[in-house]
């Protein structure tokens, strides 16, 4: 139903019943043998690797022969993969030779580690850049580079490059689906129209999280290290298109839309009308400019002695600048395809970026102390009909920051010239904040916008705008849709807390509680998200159950958010999707009504 048409059985032959089902359903299968010597890679030296030690030839052939003979009659198998991440050498070549001889040359042999295509029939890559894909598919210069300088394929000779550019191409792994993401699927999908491009396999299908029982008797999903083991991969085992409970991630929906826009599951998921609630919110959204100023500002809101808003109507509310997000697994990625400080006009050889391992975006943000942003009051000048607040926001001991000039103006909820459906009986406050940066900000920032905080965590959200969780490189499906969800259901699925609730293109948002409703009507372009926990609380938690019960709700209104990418094990979010600190103005209306 997702439009998936092929399976790679990484990294060993599957249960036979899976192949029976694949035959029946019509799925293609890349049948992968049980060979992997990843631990011998070391510093890319492959010292004493069994793949190139003739004493291991019989074992390699035994595993290859057993896999083939067991499954040879399954119509779903389109090629035989020798194994995974085992370097290269004489034993893998012998296994490929056996398969070719056993099938009288008809069998298609795959193995990603044969970078020079000495014994396989398909050129295969893991996590290539878009430029690498384009280079492999471009046969105008048969001897041009086929890989970024740091990849082993960059060193192959001209004869190998000619073989590569005449062979079918497949990405045996791409778009590492770990945590929020992966971003960038659409660009890879566009390249798959080339006649030599056979497609690719996203890593991977399902999170490998297991149930554990907490001291209080609750059951929770767990990952590496949660069972007392000393050697583990943490939550690196949670990198599926669906979580351990088979719930698709937001990035999965974006990937399906890019690869299979007519997939049945997308039709089943199409948005339905919200009837009266939708009609009312759309009427409000269409009249954002019709809210007229009224009287004294104190008639709609309460401010402290420095001009900071404390409540609108009877609802306590605070407003702050926000530039940090709880890092995603991709924000924490350390791979060499790093686009930090890189321009879209110069991505380096075949899109390599900095080409340096080791430093993640999350580390850079935290080294810049963006998570510790502090404000300093700089004045509250009096202006007719509005409250003005001037602040400076900066990390501790930093030589950069921003000046925020807030204007708070009471407006009439009856909305002059608007239909009755758009009338609001309550207190309304127009908010305008001008953000002017100074000093040298980090090359990319997590976000820039406003964070509101209101009491209580039992809110129901209804909104007009993008209905799906989406980011600049992870587009949604319905930019002018209507959504409705409980606060707890607004965030992406997954076992480890991280950024994962942003919806761009907000036109109007209503949060309904037990006694009142908060309505937010943008007057400038912005996205939104909401959570009972702050970005720092989310960032510090290893599991959702580590978060204490909350009695407040944070609402983020973002002018910009950084892209997602797939750097947990692949390329960074590309520069064109990056968030940068620039001067910007945000405007919105806050209305509080009794229920």
Residue ranges of each PLM-predicted region?
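Beta-strand/loop-rich accessory regions of lumenal/periplasmic or secreted enzymes
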Residues: 278-595
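Extended substrate-binding grooves/exosites of carbohydrate-active enzymes
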Residues: 1-282
